[in-house]
């Protein structure tokens, strides 16, 4: 006798279990945080300020756009939490509330806006030129949002 596996079988129900969904979500947030850490190590030092240009802003944009607002923001929050407790996750493998920590706070804003921008862009029903203009405007807003907490810090 041959038994067919159906979508109600143990394997099928495991694939759609809430526990597995939580593991997947946690894995995506961890991958986003790891991306922020590694890409944020790429820096361009400036002679007139202790704050270098880093690829962290780009990473926050990318993580927010790819993972969505919620997961992107959680990835940035996890990065901030790790840095706040002293883990060496910031540029130059530094940790703590250093001079650039305000920009890390801004990464949460960037991820939220970039995730929303990606959603709006994908659902925009106008012409391609209109979609590109909307996407560029929202990504520029996201990029600029890092400077508010960064400069205040």
What are the residue ranges of the model-derived segments?
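Short helix-perturbing small/polar motifs within transmembrane alpha-helices
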Residues: 2-17, 24, 38, 93-148
């Amino acid at each position: 006798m041959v038994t067919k596996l159906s979508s109600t079988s143990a394997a099928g129900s495991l694939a759609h279990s809430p526990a597995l969904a939580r593991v997947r979500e946690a894995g995506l947030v961890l991958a986003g945080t790891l991306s922020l850490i590694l890409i944020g190590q790429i820096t361009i030092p400036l002679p007139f300020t202790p704050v270098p240009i880093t690829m962290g802003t780009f990473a926050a944009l990318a993580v927010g756009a790819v993972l969505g607002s919620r997961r992107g923001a959680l990835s940035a929050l996890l990065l901030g939490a790790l840095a706040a407790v002293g883990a060496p996750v910031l540029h130059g493998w530094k940790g703590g509330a250093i001079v650039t920590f305000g920009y890390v706070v801004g990464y949460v804003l960037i991820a939220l806006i970039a995730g929303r921008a990606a959603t709006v862009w994908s659902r925009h029903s106008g012409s391609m030129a209109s979609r590109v203009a909307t996407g560029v405007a929202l990504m520029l807003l996201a990029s600029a949002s890092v400077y508010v907490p960064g400069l205040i810090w």
